[in-house]
């Protein structure tokens, strides 16, 4: 421990939705704990939490087909129900914060937006019908609708059917109670709350090194990128919620739990329109079906996004490759993350995921016209003059060692925590932000086992279904969802 270092209870590395959520949970549970946040950029929520960088918002598995795979003729809904349950916990915590006055004006970060799935062709329509039948029997999905009638689809999302071939077989599902979430706005609100209650935010501060002190605390060396000065801090607990930057920092920590992990960075692009005439004809998040053999991140979707009170449409994502782990990261990020302990898992992933590599190459080589044709498959009336391309954020998929294959590519998030609970970090991507609350609850349970029993009562007050399933009593499920919808000013 350094004599010159400031001592704090908690350091949060990264100013995104994960750090903001964990900090808010801790501040609600332990108001007297000291918290410092270090963000390398000049504002919070500028990387994956930024709404224009976030590939999917309001994830609740209502419309994403990759969460309901079909095996041996049976639709598996386990992933979908689990993710929806997790999203309900996030909603409950946000509703608590709104009720408590900690997060004002819910419409500034969450808005009612129907979630739809749209498919073309007889075979895909039959699959969608089977998926609908499987999900509708579950209490969290029983309000879902299905149709193959173009007139009904037109009433739900006109742009999907205008000027479409009348002989084409199409089908869609809709869940009217879906949402669009601006995680950038929510992050800012949570950070404001933390600062109002004593937390310190340090912008333009990059954590360059961390090491464990003899007393079990962590010593962090932080560079102020404005004055090029160095700040030293000792913390009892460190959370690394730095998006793609989490892997290198966890590696620097030297904890054995990070061994065998690597990161596979994937960039993305969108077509975006702000034209009010076009935007007015589409109020939904509409997900399609990925081409056979394509990875989950290739699922096309036409999204309504509400940012700063203004509504736009996004279509994509079109994947690409960049070795950066952050949108404003270094071209050396991927190569600098290679270690003797993760080189074999990384090579195994490359060998077993040639279809992903082929897909990324095809996306990189695709012309703007070819990419726009994919939008026209969704929206036949799309005109290039109304749309412009934007670059999305970086997604760093988890690569981890595997006893059988040597290494596997994991689509999802993973908490990596030291055995003593003194440090933890979050790796991975989707469903990400939408499940921030249950992910951070997992961090609390793993890192503060001696405190969790005493926290259970306040956690249950904030999140009524903490430790239980919203769908465990189907008769109560609608009431639970209705209560959060009313507080968050959502339709239900």
Swiss-Prot record:
First-level EC class: oxidoreductase
Identification of the protein by name: Probable malate:quinone oxidoreductase
Swiss-Prot/TrEMBL cofactor(s): FAD
Classification via Gene3D superfamilies: D-Amino Acid Oxidase, subunit A, domain 2, FAD/NAD(P)-binding domain
Reactions listed under catalytic activity: (S)-malate + a quinone = a quinol + oxaloacetate
Species per Swiss-Prot/TrEMBL record: Clavibacter sepedonicus (Clavibacter michiganensis subsp. sepedonicus)
Pathway membership: Carbohydrate metabolism; tricarboxylic acid cycle; oxaloacetate from (S)-malate (quinone route): step 1/1
PANTHER family on file: L-2-HYDROXYGLUTARATE DEHYDROGENASE, MITOCHONDRIAL
EC number in record: 1.1.5.4
Alphabetical UniProt keywords: FAD, Flavoprotein, Oxidoreductase, Tricarboxylic acid cycle
GO terms for MF: 2-hydroxyglutarate dehydrogenase activity; L-malate dehydrogenase (quinone) activity
Family membership noted in the UniProt record: Belongs to the MQO family.
Gene: mqo
Keyword Methyltransferase found: no
Flavoprotein as UniProt keyword: yes
GO BP: tricarboxylic acid cycle
Pfam entry (one): Mqo
InterPro entries: FAD/NAD-bd_sf (IPR036188), MQO (IPR006231)
